[in-house]
Amino acid sequence: RDDIAQRRAMLLVDEVGGHERILAQFALCPGEDPTYHHIEDGAWPEDVPYATIHRLASAGHVGGIGRLCVQWCLQQGLPVRADTHADNTYMQHTLKACGFVRCGTIYTEDGTPRWAYYHYAI
């Protein structure tokens, strides 16, 4: 709900048989993310304003939808950071395919480790 209230929730939809269907949802959050202040086993390549991709989820109707969402984020004019679990190979593949580089490990508020990725502004 916070993503909606702050106008950062995004939906990717299409139309089939005259009805819209949700293909994916994600949040693009501009500004500093406190979770990213400390990074281990690496470093962020630059210290500039950025946006973060959070909560990317596909409905599973169409292949490659995660990549389309990430590519849209990259077109918004800011460097982009993202993170994912070590076992989320789908997201790791999507980020790498879109040109992200792994920069190290960050930890969520509850201490969960996440692989951290970065893409320069395009």
Language model segments and positions:
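Conserved GNAT acetyl-CoA-binding A-motif
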Residues: 52, 75-87
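Conserved acyl-donor/pantetheine-binding loop and adjacent beta-alpha core of acyl/acetyltransferases
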Residues: 27-61
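Glycine-rich acetyl-CoA-binding "A-motif" of GNAT/NAT acetyltransferases
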Residues: 19-24, 90
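Conserved acetyl-CoA-binding loop-helix of GNAT-fold acetyltransferases
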Residues: 58-75, 92-97
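Short hydrophobic/aromatic beta-strand element in the GNAT-like acyltransferase core
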Residues: 8-13, 25, 55, 114-116
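Conserved active-site alpha-helix within GNAT-family acetyltransferase domains
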Residues: 67, 86-105, 112
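Active-site rim helix/loop that mediates acceptor-substrate recognition in acyltransferases
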Residues: 1-10, 17
